[in-house]
């Protein structure tokens, strides 16, 4: 999770999403949007903090490098990893993060709380088709989608129960 903080009422989404992420998942974060959710104690997984703060907007590239290295080590690509990217935006730095991710071919990125003004409906539709770019909506439904990468989760599935 990364990007800008903004006074937009939709920013509560990010805090709620971090509350819902299961205890066996890591949260890698950078940029000022993290100040909405970084004060909570997320605990650890085998001694590794669940919440890893990488710093400012510019440092999102470090998270990208980690994902690329992990994909290379596993002999796959970033889009095949069980990783979801959720960006909040307000200004140019967050847009630069999005451009970097798109340039690298990363798909399935969630952005919000609303689309950037320059993303006309036509441009957004092209990015949606080519990169599976998504607007944030409901944290519970989005998390279900993130964990299943497009596979439908039955309402009685363990993840569905965990989100309730």
Placement of each model-derived feature along the sequence:
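Anaerobic metallocofactor- and corrinoid-dependent redox/one-carbon enzyme cores
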Residues: 1-164
């Amino acid at each position: 999770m990364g990007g800008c903080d903004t006074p937009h009422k939709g920013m509560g989404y990010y805090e709620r999403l971090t509350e819902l992420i299961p205890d066996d998942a890591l949260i890698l974060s950078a940029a000022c949007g993290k100040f909405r959710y970084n004060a909570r104690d997320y605990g650890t997984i085998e001694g590794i903090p669940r919440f890893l703060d990488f710093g400012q907007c510019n440092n999102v590239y470090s998270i990208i490098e980690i994902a690329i290295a992990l994909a290379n080590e596993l002999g796959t690509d970033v889009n095949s990893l069980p990783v979801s990217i959720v960006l909040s935006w307000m200004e140019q730095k967050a847009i630069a993060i999005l451009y970097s991710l798109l340039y690298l071919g990363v798909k399935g990125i969630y952005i919000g709380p609303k689309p950037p003004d320059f993303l006309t409906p036509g441009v957004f539709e092209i990015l949606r088709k080519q990169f599976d770019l998504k607007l944030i909506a409901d944290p519970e439904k989005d998390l279900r989608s993130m964990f299943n990468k497009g596979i439908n989760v039955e309402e009685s599935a363990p993840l569905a129960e965990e989100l309730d």
